[in-house]
């Protein structure tokens, strides 16, 4: 009996030690982490989502989202997030804001590179003098532009004796996101270049003797020989490369499938392409897009009869899809032709857990034109 009680006692100890650990371990979800460049884990806000719902789905809190995005572009708090916004779900540097095809100022102009100093984000692509850049990336002088929600991240330090919108010639003006600061920097750069050229000319003029000239001639001759050899080598290399050239690597296509009914049922369009990285190419759904399948370009087909029949997208009459699926890439959808900015445009991305997205009240009312690409 003594042995029996000892075994039960040992088993009970094992349950107490192992059981809680296994249970708690199973309940812990993987929390998003910053990438290798210390850029935070980026998330694209979907239609109708709130910080609370996003936080719950990623095992963090709403307060965490507020903290992670304190320095994000145009961040006004969880109460005003919009579909298509890039937000942080982990610690780390903020991501560049989503590019807007129509933007002419600010960091959302297509192709804008990330600044080395994040606090200078607001000074990128400035408007002409006396104009303000709105949160939608347009220049103007009305209160709609000059009281925009877009702003320099809160971490930016400013001199307390410098007032907004005042011109200044001190070096401290560089830390203020005002358009006059940019021309001042260009003038300084130009002056320094000019000074450098003058010094170089002076040094050349000061060569005094014939011996120096002769030496220069020999050096020049040697350089020419070296250059010729290099060019010859490069030519051979290129010839060898062209001989062994293979077909370019096929990029996995992005695609946007749009259905006539909810839950991704009914007739549908399939729009797909292979372009990698953002470009300003606009795709009008009924703009003569090719229906020919390709490994490099864009194609668009209209499927009917349960997918058994297909033709060009121009033949389809659907402009207000009730559901859709985005795969691989990002598609910004506009309710007007030529991807012209309007208040109803939205960016759509894949949703792995629920690929089919049904229409909601915040979605783009009409799918007329698109700007799509894959991030690679």
Curated annotation (Swiss-Prot):
Main location: secreted
Role description: Secreted LysM effector that might have a role in sequestration of chitin oligosaccharides (breakdown products of fungal cell walls that are released during invasion and act as triggers of host immunity) to dampen host defense.
A Pfam family it matches: LysM
Gene Ontology cellular component list: extracellular region
GO molecular-function term, one example from the UniProt record: chitin binding
Note: In plants, chitin acts as a microbe-associated molecular pattern (MAMP) that is recognized by lysin motif (LysM)-containing plant cell surface-localized pattern recognition receptors (PRRs) that activate a plethora of downstream immune responses.
LysM domain: residues covered: 41-89
Species lineage: Eukaryota, Fungi, Dikarya, Ascomycota, Pezizomycotina
Residues spanning the signal sequence: 1-25
Subcellular location: Secreted
Protein source organism: Penicillium expansum (Blue mold rot fungus)
Protein name as it appears in the record: Secreted LysM effector LysM9
Domain-related comment: The LysM (lysin motif) domains are small globular domains involved in binding chitin in eukaryotes. LysM9 contains one LysM domain.
């Amino acid at each position: 009996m003594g042995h029996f009680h000892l075994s039960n006692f040992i088993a009970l100890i094992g349950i107490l030690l192992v059981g809680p650990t296994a249970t708690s371990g199973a309940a812990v979800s993987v929390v998003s982490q910053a990438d290798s460049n210390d850029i935070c884990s980026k998330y694209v806000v979907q239609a109708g989502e709130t910080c609370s719902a996003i936080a719950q789905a990623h095992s963090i809190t709403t307060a965490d989202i507020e903290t992670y995005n304190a320095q994000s572009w145009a961040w006004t708090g969880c109460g005003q997030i919009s579909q298509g916004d890039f937000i942080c779900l982990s610690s780390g540097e903020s991501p560049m804001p989503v590019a807007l095809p129509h933007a002419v100022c600010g960091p959302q102009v297509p192709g804008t590179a990330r600044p080395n100093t994040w606090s200078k984000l607001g000074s990128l692509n400035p408007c002409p003098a006396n104009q303000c850049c709105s949160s939608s990336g347009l220049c103007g002088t009305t209160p709609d532009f000059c009281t925009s929600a877009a702003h320099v991240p809160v971490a930016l330090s400013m001199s307390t004796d410098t007032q907004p919108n005042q011109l200044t010639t001190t070096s401290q003006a560089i830390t203020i996101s005002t358009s006059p600061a940019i021309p001042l920097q260009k003038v300084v750069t130009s002056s320094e270049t000019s000074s450098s050229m003058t010094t170089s000319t002076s040094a050349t003029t000061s060569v005094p003797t014939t011996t120096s000239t002769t030496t220069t001639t020999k050096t020049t001759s040697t350089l020419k020989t070296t250059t010729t050899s290099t060019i010859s080598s490069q030519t051979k290399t290129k010839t060898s490369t062209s001989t062994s050239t293979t077909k370019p690597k096929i990029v996995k296509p992005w695609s946007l499938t749009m259905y006539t009914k909810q839950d991704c049922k009914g007739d549908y369009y399939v729009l797909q392409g292979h372009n990698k990285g953002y470009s300003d190419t606009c795709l009008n759904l009924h703009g003569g897009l090719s229906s020919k399948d390709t490994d490099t370009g864009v194609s668009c087909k209209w499927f009917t009869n349960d997918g058994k029949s297909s033709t060009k997208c121009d033949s389809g009459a659907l402009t207000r899809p009730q559901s859709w699926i985005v795969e691989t890439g990002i598609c910004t959808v506009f309710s007007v032709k030529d991807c012209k900015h309007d208040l109803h445009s939205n960016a759509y991305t894949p949703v792995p857990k629920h690929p089919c997205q049904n229409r909601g009240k915040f979605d783009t009312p009409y799918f007329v034109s698109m700007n799509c690409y894959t991030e690679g």
